[in-house]
Every structure is written in structure tokens, then in C-alpha cells.
Amino acid sequence: MNNLKKKKNPSARELAVTVICTVTQQGKSLTEALTLADVLEPRDKAFCREICYGTIRWYSRLEGLLNLLLKKPFKAKDSDIKVLILTGLYQIIYLSTPDHAAVSETVSTCSAGRKSWAKGVLNGVLRNFLRNRATLEKSIDAQLNQQFSHPTWLIQQLQKDWGDQLSHILQANNQHPPMSIRVNEKAISRHQYVKQLDEAAIKTHENPFNSVGLTLDQAVNVDQLPGFWQGTCSVQDSAAQLAASLMKVEDNQRILDVCAAPGGKTAHLLESTNDSNALTAIDIDELRNQRVIENLTRLNLKADVLTVDALETAEWFDQQPFQRILLDAPCSATGVIRRHPDIKLLRQASDIKALVELQSQLLEAIWPLLEKGGRLLYATCSILSAENSQQIANFVSRHTDAQPVTIDAQWGQACEFGRQILPGQDNMDGFFYACLTKT
């Protein structure tokens, strides 16, 4: 229970504790929980976000250090005090704040609530850490799961799937991701937009794998992007920008985007094709589908957006086959941990089996909707082979009319079926793509 937030105008750190407790105790996503910080002024909100993302990113390591510093664990009702200490440890270890200031700020936060009794505990624990920091960190880093702050089950699975690339993956997952954008080529060329960005003092470099992607040297608010609200560009990781070209859409084709929300790939498909194509975007979540509609409206694009269950094709399929299908399958999201560090806390090993089964069901349901000679692109933001190459291998073994298409590319690495990008490769998120044609 969080008793720290007792003032009408809580501080950034008080709200950070509330946000983190919302994730760790209620199981809400960090993105959702961070809406609590919208009441803060921009500068305080930025600090709150940094504390939240950083503490969640390094939660297991920080918790391990705290356990070494405590004689006995905190009671459940005092979990907010535990989290407050973790934020202090994060600030000391990973931010440039002077040690004495980090300790003082953390302890003073305790005075804001009903648990002023804990001030002495906080002060003692943090100062004890400062005295014994080298020894404590050496001890905790002897264990891989705490050194890199990843759950043991995930480390074991990544070791099995990727072997000697494990260390690279774990390190990449803890890096701050870049901000990438996709220029809407129906509105402006990348070359022209770069000029506008230069005039706005926003420095970028071009995505080498397509003609519309840019990565910003430093993240900015979308309000600072020239013409953003008029549809000049969208925020989208470089890996997700690869889908449109892999679809190889031709004129006068019917396109189906399955699990389309929030619509980034939907919009890119429409931006990169002409108006002779008809695109249907489906998703089971009505609220998320509203995001699709909002994005398409901002970009001045049109599609048939349906809130339906992709598995129940009899309820929405009009019996007119599609020439192109994109299945952006629900997955473990293990490729985007650097953007969503709460995945390390919220995702469980038991989730993977259920996700693999759902992906298989979606493939089985959607495959009959593809016209003979048509192309299906299977995509995930996972780096687990069970959801990716093995999933496609199993599907192909069951369907003699499914022909794998080799993806000839300069990005990622080839798998038996499909192509995998690991986190951080070419500054991209972890992503998997596999192409199938129907014979």
C-alpha cells in the first residue's frame, strides 16, 4: 500500500513510487501506470519517467542489493518504502546526481507521508550502501540474473535459443532505445523532411534499410516534429518499418492486416501503396482500434477498420480472398524490453506456451483467407524461437501449400524460416519476419 502520496501536489519521486508500485503490485504496464504522472510539470514529469523506467529496468539488481543491506525484509504494507529505497539506489548508481543529494532527496520524500518513522531506515540503508558499494555490487553481479536484471527463466531460454549471443542481448535490453520516425511519403519526401528537421535543430540519420526512416540523435516530444499533427511523420522503430516492403504489395490488391492496432504498420502499408488497393485492418480490442482510426485520420489515410476476433472468420470474412496478409501476431514482446522494461517483471515463463498456441490458431484461421499465389507476412517483436522460426516450421509442416520465401536482406540474421533481428542490431528493436506464399 502506498501511503507516501498524501499531498495535493505530490513530488515527482512520490509519484514515481506510486507508478512503480502500480506495476509491481497490480501488474499494470508501465505505460499505463505512467499516466499518473500527467499531473506534473514537464520537467518533473521527465524526472519521474527517468526514475520509473530506470528503477523498473534494474529492478532485480536493485532489489538484490537491498536484500543484502536489510536485516529483514519489509512487510507487505511497507512495500512503498522498499520501492522508495530502490529509487534512491537507482539514482545513486545510474544517474549523475551527487550521492549526498540523492540520499537527502530520497529521505525527504518519506517526510511527505505517514511513514516518517522510515526516515532513519532509508538514511541508514543508503549510507551503508555508499560505504560498501564496491563489495555489494561485486557480490550481486556474480549472478547473471541480477547482474543484468532479467528473470532466470528468460535467461535460460535465451541461452538455449541464442547461445553465445546471450550477453549481447542482455546488455542491449538494458540500453536506452533511440527514437525513430517514419516519414509519410504521400505528404513529403524524406530528403525534404530532413531539411525541415534541420531548421528545427533536430538532428537525425537515415535508416539505411528503407527510404522513409529516420533515427533522431536525441528524442523529442512529437509536438516538436514539424507537421506531425498534419501527418508528415509517425513514431515507429526502424525494425517495424521493414514490414511494408516485405509485403511487396502490387496494384489493385486486397490487403488484410491482422492484429493491426495501434496501426503503425497499417499506415505504412497505405503510405507506400497507391489508392487502387483496399486494406482491411482488424483487431479484437475496440479501444486500441480507436488508436488505428486516430492515426489514419492524422495521416489522411483510409482503411476499413474492424473490431473483430480474427479467429472467428465466419463472422466477418466476406468470402473475397486477400492477395496480401500481414499477421502481426501477439507475442512475448521479448524483443522490445529496452522500450518496455516492465516486461521483465510482468512476463512469466508460463505465458509463452499460451502465446505460441494463440499464434498457431491465428495462422490456421487466417491462411484460408489468402488467395492462391498470395503472400502472408508473419511478424512478431519476440526473440524466442518458439514464437518465430519454430512456429513457422510447424505451420509449414502441416500445410503443403505453404511455401517459405527467403528474405534476402542486409539486416538481422537468417533463421531456418524467416529472419531475426536481435535487440540493438543496427540500432533496432528485436523483431522477426517470415514470408509465406500459397501454392
Task: Describe these PLM feature segments.
Residues 1-439:
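S-adenosylmethionine
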